[in-house]
Amino acid sequence: MEDFARGAASPGPSRPGLVPVSIIGAEDEDFENELETNSEEQNSQFQSLEQVKRRPAHLMALLQHVALQFEPGPLLCCLHADMLGSLGPKEAKKAFLDFYHSFLEKTAVLRVPVPPNVAFELDRTRADLISEDVQRRFVQEVVQSQQVAVGRQLEDFRSKRLMGMTPWEQELAQLEAWVGRDRASYEARERHVAERLLMHLEEMQHTISTDEEKSAAVVNAIGLYMRHLGVRTKSGDKKSGRNFFRKKVMGNRRSDEPAKTKKGLSSILDAARWNRGEPQVPDFRHLKAEVDAEKPGATDRKGGVGMPSRDRNIGAPGQDTPGVSLHPLSLDSPDREPGADAPLELGDSSPQGPMSLESLAPPESTDEGAETESPEPGDEGEPGRSGLELEPEEPPGWRELVPPDTLHSLPKSQVKRQEVISELLVTEAAHVRMLRVLHDLFFQPMAECLFFPLEELQNIFPSLDELIEVHSLFLDRLMKRRQESGYLIEEIGDVLLARFDGAEGSWFQKISSRFCSRQSFALEQLKAKQRKDPRFCAFVQEAESRPRCRRLQLKDMIPTEMQRLTKYPLLLQSIGQNTEEPTEREKVELAAECCREILHHVNQAVRDMEDLLRLKDYQRRLDLSHLRQSSDPMLSEFKNLDITKKKLVHEGPLTWRVTKDKAVEVHVLLLDDLLLLLQRQDERLLLKSHSRTLTPTPDGKTMLRPVLRLTSAMTREVATDHKAFYVLFTWDQEAQIYELVAQTVSERKNWCALITETAGSLKVPAPASRPKPRPSPSSTREPLLSSSENGNGGRETSPADARTERILSDLLPFCRPGPEGQLAATALRKVLSLKQLLFPAEEDNGAGPPRDGDGVPGGGPLSPARTQEIQENLLSLEETMKQLEELEEEFCRLRPLLSQLGGNSVPQPGCT
């Protein structure tokens, strides 16, 4: 009977109008309760994550339960992955970095289990270099791996809810009573309940975990996703409300909330990432800031704009605007890059929806909207701002001030040109204002309060005063040209060239490179200081809360200079494309090219500094104990190896095949003159030699060293494995061959090209004296081991390959950089020079006899100066002839080997 009842009750809810037959007796009370329980569970909002994540209040109850009972990382990871999927390609690529640092990085507070293949790829490739498709695939695989944990958490919540042990059950029951009423009212009430639950969770933050850092990370992650759903978060707006994520249009949002469709999303776990424990910060204090000659004092600060500009919305900066936006879409739109070929018409207002829900918004929402539109009280002392203030519902000022007839007569390209010029001016003013905020609210107070030594503070904010001066002067020139031209700028090329070309451009490139290259170091230093010094942490939070910061954090302001440099080429390119006059167009295009060169130089400086920081981290973890204990004389000079003094060319994981039965996973560093094979052991990086035999020989000839000099290195593809390659080199007359295996064929090609290029760029100085003739390679050392002995993965080696390897080992001693230039041509020039010295009166095309008394033999003595010059030329000629003799000897030994390689074992005649 019970089985039958279960079968009858198993389908979903019965259709209206049909009354099921009751077949349960009075004695089956427990079974009846079970049926009611199953029915309640079927109607629950917590059957799957897809259902609950559309209900902010229900999701908050689930999140609180999971945060207090489980590890919340998997659930938060899935939610933030869903948020990533709602972004456009460009925004998603940037947001993936925050997702990586929050959930995938090894030091992340909320790190989740990562599939091995994804973890391997992330270890070998920087997150910012991964393509969009691969990023999407990684996120999908990570989310898929979290489904079991999330399903277990949902199951636990459902079972606890049936027993009345889940939080906020009464509030959820009251909310569910509103289902079926007016949709707008229900959604407003749902958001209100979610806000209350979120506020309560923030108040009980300290109970989530004993680790305060983790508790803050969990609360910030939850708050970020709630803002994504349209729930207002007071603490999030003040501390972590950033605009790293930016949605073009909320696909499933309500059409009657226009403000929510443009709402920016924050960087994942801003406060958590800011306070998260990181590896030891490299000591940069020895990198003293360069001291330059004092330049004239900064001009009057003009043009600080009180309106939000697109420049502040690029990259990290951003704002939440819960109220109705009054500005045209084109100035604040996150969907368009500045300087695009077809900028939006600024006169077009953004679509506005009905205002039926305006009364449901909290009272402070209007104030927040007004804060972003009007000048702030903290911005006084910046004259010239009013010239750029725009009316909230009107297009830029140049349209108003240009006569209507002139405006209507302008061609479309000219209108676009004026729009981009106006955008250049407005965003430049916003950038100047941001730099002044950095100086006035952070740099200067830090110096006065002695939070950092002055030298270290100058490394955190290098050349900040000079940058303010340069950008302010550029803004003043743009403002002046705008006023002189009556707000319709015809010629701007000379102003642009004066800023980006010549000496001024070089100075701008120097100070911007200095500032941008230190930004990673600055962020690390500030994080470390905030983590250790509560007084400094309070100072930063107080400064960030000021109106002038516009809810931006310090870590969001530091990268603004780099972001600004990326916009100049785009803006200037757009101006040039819409300029018809050839001379003016040429000037603008030249200025755009100068901007690209400056950006390229700055990017290179940033990469070099990042490489230096990475080398410092590797140096800190480098374990040289094996080298110091080794008796190998070849390794004696590397016992105190300092890789920070070298240049990092490339790095990545490879497999080192020592023998056919032994392979070692190594992290390879290609430096400017060395190739290092590092073995990871916990956090340490070992430089360890390996023997090709079970018992190393006393002379060390069977040892493969982890340090390879590149002066004589060359690469060769392994014929039987397209992912593998050989690195062959000679070291003090000893030739060795290493077999390394990459993950893909393209990686193998890249490694071979970089090693060959780096080795080819090294120059060996010519010997000061004639070296001794090289003995035959076979007479001084054992033959170079074949590919199978050095590790061929158990593959069979053909006789032809073995023969090739043997001949190749004999050829290795000859693989060294040749002398610069051609020796024969040099010797001939020396002979002609001596001829001119001995016979100065003889013309190049003449063959007559020399005159008496001109210093020729038999005609009189030579002058002392000429005698000295002739002697030097003779010595140089003698050295050149010795080098030619050495080359001839080497060639004679090389010809038989080349004959064998070509299949002819008979040596060619002509060498004795």
Curated annotation (Swiss-Prot):
It is found in: Cytoplasm; Membrane. The gene is ARHGEF1. Seems to play a role in the regulation of RhoA GTPase by guanine nucleotide-binding alpha-12 (GNA12) and alpha-13 (GNA13) subunits. Acts as a GTPase-activating protein (GAP) for GNA12 and GNA13, and as guanine nucleotide exchange factor (GEF) for RhoA GTPase. Activated G alpha 13/GNA13 stimulates the RhoGEF activity through interaction with the RGS-like domain. This GEF activity is inhibited by binding to activated GNA12. Mediates angiotensin-2-induced RhoA activation. Changing residue 738 to F: Lowers the exchange activity. One of its GO terms (molecular function) is RNA binding. Ubiquitously expressed. Residues 365-381 have a biased composition (Acidic residues). The lineage of its organism: Eukaryota, Metazoa, Chordata, Craniata, Vertebrata. Phosphorylated by PKCA. Angiotensin-2 induced Tyr-738 phosphorylation is mediated by JAK2. The modification Phosphoserine is found at residues 374, 409, 863. PROSITE patterns: DH_2 (PS50010), PH_DOMAIN (PS50003). This is Rho guanine nucleotide exchange factor 1. Residues 248-413, 763-802, 841-865 are annotated as: Disordered. The modification Phosphothreonine is found at residue 695. Transmembrane segments: none annotated. It is linked to Immunodeficiency 62: An autosomal recessive, primary immunologic disorder characterized by recurrent severe respiratory tract infections and bronchiectasis, due to antibody deficiency. Affected individuals have an abnormal B cell immunophenotype, with low levels of circulating memory B cells. The keyword tRNA processing does not apply. Residues 41-232 form the RGSL domain. It comes from Homo sapiens. Interacts with RHOA, GNA12 and GNA13. Homooligomerizes through the coiled coil region. May interact with CCPG1. Interacts with CTNNAL1. Residues 416-605 form the DH domain.
